[in-house]
Amino acid sequence: MRKFTLLMLLLIVISMSGIAGAAEVKNLNTSKTFTKIQEAIDDPSTTDGNIIIVGPGNYTENILVNKSLTLKSNGSAIINAVSSEKSTITIKANNVWIEGFIIIGGKNGIYMENVTGCTITNNTIQNAFVSGWEYYGGNGICLVNSTNNTITNNIIRNNTWNGINVCESKGNIIKNNTIMYSGGIGIYVWGFNKFEGNNIIENNRIINATYGGIYLFRPSNNKICRNYIANVSSGGGGMSGAICIDVSDYNIVKDNIGINCDGGLFTDGMIGNEITNNIFKNCKVAVSESTYGPASRNNKIYGNYFINYETAISDPKGELVDNIWNTTEGGNYWSNYTGNNTGDGTGNIPYYYDNKPLVVDLAIEDIAAKPSGIEVRVKNLGKADIKKIDPLTKLKIKISCDNDVYETFIDPLSAGESQIVRWDKIVPEGNHTIKAEIPYSAEGYLIGTNIRDADISNNVFSKIVQGFVQNKTFTITLTNLGKSTITIKYYISIYTNPVNGTKVSYRELTITLKPNETKTIELGKYPFKYAVSGTMIVKNPSRYRIPLNLRIKYEIEGLNPQMREISKYIAPRGEFRYIARYTGKEEGYADVW
């Protein structure tokens, strides 16, 4: 009985394990289900255009897709190659769609040969392995003689050789992929002979590759745009860079970023390429030309930013001279360049082959005293964009006036961009000298940065300005100190000065104050030397005399107020009339008379 019970428990456990680990593959068009992906593909009723949904689970198989199918998973289907001699997925049909898988191992993660119109999207592809060098092995994705395919939004990592290997394939779109830890190259486009590529490679992130970020070997007319490449080493061979163009012609290489690589731009025998608006930062060698192949010539290389390099240009044979390094507007930015601004935003002496190096030239353009404070206009007169050099840097600005000093920081400025620095110091009436400066080191570097200012003569600017008569708030506050309610008629005029000024305002007010009640009359904002003239009338309508106990406070914003108190009786059916004027004094108080 005990043995029978144990046997039943074992069968239940095995049954439950099978249910928990079961994976379902379903053809949505035929409604058939399978336990293997290859079974679903090979089924005779599976035809071109069918959609196969692969449920969560582990699938240990090498898959051959030889029909125009869509294979989709929600990101939880893991395909492990059963044989490392074959690719995990091999595509031999056109118009195949692969989406949402975790693809592990195999000779390649995905291998595509002689196909067109396929889409590989939203997959994680990792650990493709070969033990030695192979043309078509050890890659996350490998395309051979394939056209017009789309590879997007994949994570490709830890492969023996290349993240994406594109051999003699044309018109493909490779974008928005993240490629990490490639033993070879991040994206390698190559051929045994020169060929028309017309591939688009854009918005990819390539991190930690051994022999190059994006490497073009013999294809032409490709677009390499807006890619981010970091941490590319040379693998000991010396022929490496964030972007490598090797015997490859008429490509557009634009708006890419290469950071922390052994090389920024590697060239060899390239012709007619446009290499513009790229940023190469913290690379040991900014630009290097191979010593093995033919000379690179007739390439446009300008508008690029080469920042914090050890060697600007490595060109032992002088083969990079026959290229276009600048237009009439300017060339490239070189962080180690020490020339000065010629007045047009470029350097006054060439830098290697670049005759018009882009420079930074911060200048104090103007100083103004405004009613709200001091304004200083700072402008980058250079043609180098500081936002590209260091988007996180802060530029120090120092302003002084009347022994007061104000220091602040502004964000980086693009070429030709201005920024207003505001200091809320109110400049009083009269002449005052305001000095503004952009601090720099003895070598001409902007303080707190690694950015050299190419013209320090305009970093300091002094100007004598006329201060403003500041408008102040005038108020009168009335407090009834007596025990009876009183009514006050108040006639108030405001003049431009207390002697013979022009009347600028007139008001008639009726104010009722209960015992111990306080009310404030706000007269408006005027220069503190304006004068307020007020006539106050309090009437007694009764047959008896009444006491009047009133406190009056005269105030001008920022000055010491003055108080007056009235304590007297008003005759029966009589009235009390009180006339007073007040103005502001330079000494800082309100004067009442």
Swiss-Prot record:
Listed Pfam families: NosD
Cleavable signal peptide: 1-22
Keywords: Cell wall, Cell wall biogenesis/degradation, Glycoprotein, S-layer, Secreted, Signal
Transmembrane segments: none
Entry annotated with the keyword Glycoprotein: yes
Tagged with keyword S-adenosyl-L-methionine: no
One GO CC term on file: S-layer
UniProt PTM comment: N-glycosylated; contains glycans composed of methyl-Man, Man and GalNAc residues in a molar ratio of 2:3:1.
Glycosylation site positions: 29, 58, 66, 74, 114, 122, 145, 148, 158, 176, 208, 231, 326, 336, 340, 431, 471, 500, 516
Cellular localization per UniProt: Secreted, Cell wall, S-layer
Job of this protein: The S-layer is a paracrystalline mono-layered assembly of proteins which coat the surface of the cell.
Protein name, entry field: Cell surface glycoprotein
UniProt source species: Methanothermus fervidus (strain ATCC 43054 / DSM 2088 / JCM 10308 / V24 S)
